[in-house]
Amino acid sequence: MAAPSEDVSCEDFTEFQEILRVMRTIDDRIVHELNTTLPTVSFAGKIDAGQTCKQLYESLQTAHTSRDKAIKRCIAQTSTAVNILQGERLKDSDNLTLIKLLRKEQSKLKFLKSELNVEEVVNDRSRKVFNERCRLHYKPPKME
């Protein structure tokens, strides 16, 4: 996994996306991880599949939580910036630099919100693959 969610910069959306891409590595490699760590029938006694699945589940949950916090923190930060800029625009509606900056921040906010949808798809895919391979070995705690 990459940087903790509080270390992720929200200023540059392209950089933020790149950091998310790196943070999603565990999800991208889940099939490979399961294939290399879960035993086949012939090796079933040599590896504790329950423990392996539990560790993978905990890693996935940590990654999902970290990314979710980073995205939501950046959304909150950008929303605040948009609100401030909107207030300034009301006072100075002819300032083109201000209008341009406001549009830029509004676009960034829209893109950040779309990352929440991407995150949902990535998480659902990982859970599905995890459940297909680990359901017999490990039952994750119920989500509230």
Swiss-Prot record:
GO cellular component: mitochondrial intermembrane space; mitochondrion
Presence of keyword Coiled coil: yes
Ranges that cross the membrane: none
A Pfam family it matches: MIX23
InterPro entries on file: MIX23 (IPR019171)
Keywords tagged on the record: Coiled coil
Coiled coil residues, start to end: 82-120
Superkingdom in the source lineage: Eukaryota
Family, per entry: Belongs to the MIX23 family.
Protein name: Protein MIX23
Natural source organism: Xenopus laevis (African clawed frog)
Gene: mix23
